[in-house]
Curated annotation (Swiss-Prot):
Enzyme Commission numbers on file: 4.1.3.40
GO MF annotations in UniProt: chorismate lyase activity
Subcellular location(s) per record: Cytoplasm
Keyword Cell division: no
Protein name stated in the entry: Probable chorismate pyruvate-lyase 2
Keywords: Cytoplasm, Lyase, Pyruvate, Ubiquinone biosynthesis
GO cellular component, as recorded: cytosol
Species name: Pseudomonas fluorescens (strain Pf0-1)
Length: 183
């Protein structure tokens, strides 16, 4: 069951109307977002942790991870920044049982990028990217805005699945317009 006002995550094939070409490119780029942001910022990239801890996962997250509703998992919320500006809000989740059995220490990442870890470990397989207009009330207070594009994908390694959602903030689009040669 979805929370009230929960988004309907869609693959590109079900997306209508399509966003503009630049937005579409950022949403469905299958490479490392960390690397792309690092390039856009001319190496002025950083990660600011906002929350890390055990929480009851949202129903849409449980469904995406094939977990029972109300399952507990590790939640990590961060800002991905370019030159100190929050460009992306990211929320990564994994079930308690899968993390405890796998040895991935999400609680030890600190200001390091989870994305880099996922892309450097070739044992992780990425599933299809899904997108939505992310619910405003799910964003941190300082970043709340209606209609922001978000994307998510699931990374699997054996019994471990990590769901990574990335919400593109207006400051990212400003940077993209200002530095098209870095995109």
């Amino acid at each position: 069951m979805q929370h009230t006002n929960a988004p309907l995550w869609r693959p590109q094939s079900e997306l209508t109307p399509l966003p503009d070409t630049s937005t579409l490119d950022w949403l469905f780029d299958e490479g490392s977002l960390t690397r792309r942001l690092t390039h856009l910022s001319d190496d002025g990239f950083s990660v600011t942790p906002l929350f890390e801890g055990w929480q009851t996962l949202r129903d849409d997250e449980c469904a995406a991870l094939d977990l029972a509703e109300g399952s507990e998992g590790w939640v990590r919320e961060v800002y991905l920044r370019g030159h100190g500006q929050a460009w992306v809000f990211a929320r990564s989740v994994a079930s308690r049982s899968a993390l405890q059995g796998d040895g991935l220490h999400m609680d030890e990442l600190g200001s390091r990028s989870l994305g880099e870890l996922l892309f450097c470990d070739h044992a992780f397989q990425r599933r299809a990217i899904e997108v939505c207009h992310y619910p405003e009330h799910w964003l941190p207070e300082g970043s709340r805005a209606a209609g922001l594009w978000g994307r998510r994908s699931r990374f699997d390694r054996g019994a471990l699945s990590v769901l990574v959602a990335e919400i593109f903030l207006p400051t990212l689009w400003e940077a993209v317009r200002a530095r098209p040669e870095n995109c």
